[in-house]
Amino acid sequence: MTRKLRVCGAALLTVGAMVLRCATALAAESSACDRECLHGVMDQYLAALVAHQPEQIKTTADVKFTENTNRMKLGDGLWQTIGSLGTFKLYIEDPQSEQVAFYGTVKENGATALLGVRLKQHAQRLSEIETFVIRQASGVHGTFDNLTTVPAEWDQSVPDAERSTREQLRHDANQYFNGIEQGNGKIVPFAEDCLRIENGAQTAPTIATASRPSMSAGAQFDTHMFDYIHEITNRRFLLTDPERGLVYAVVMFQHPGNIKPQLNSVAATAAGAAPRTFSLSSYPNTTQIIETFQVRGGKIHRIFAYVSLLPYRQSPGW
């Protein structure tokens, strides 16, 4: 009799454990933040930012907040000076990692600035807040006022047959940075129509001028015009969205200042192009890039980036 009671008790404990596991799984599933939820999390953050009310944000006890790589108290920095949000709003959501990123514009004391935000959520509270503010007086190129509406292509789903895995998306983005370092566009899976926008300005394909021809992104790499970028460090591939073919990365371009860019392709020479002098190649500096790639059918079709200028070898803060 005693043995039967023990067996029965053990069975009940097993069933109880199974019920507990199921309840835990259901609770986790119900608290998971999907694409729409993450979009809302970002909107709540932006609304609090514009209202200058950081107390509206639910954070973990050990939340980390940075602006332009500098760690600071939530409520400092742009929280003090922002006026309003612009109309350009590009969102990247990654439910698997519970992260959402945002590219937009803001008004700050009457001037247009670029705003990038990355949020990571844990247990329905923000645990990571990484922000980027690029101001027109900061010495970087760009046409900020070009950014008014997000092209529809960024919100289109990739057909199942043309989708890449999360690992493939990160690999393709990493090859882009390898191609810059090596001066080799052939190792990067560029689509023929690849379009690159940096700080609101179209940088690939370039627009032909009297001193240089129009060049695709891959052709630019082959000319070694980016040799002044000695290395690309602290590569972080933080969000991936296979449904839309997006991968979001944050990297640091290191410019030692003693390497001059050259245009040495046959096409460039034939068109009478001369070596170019980039201001960023004239002195030691670092640029932090937040860059999103759109990949379809294994090819990079679109690249969107915000570029900020920092002191040489500045820590990324993460």
For every predicted segment, state its role.
Residues R21, A25-W318:
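C-terminal and inter-domain tail/linker signature
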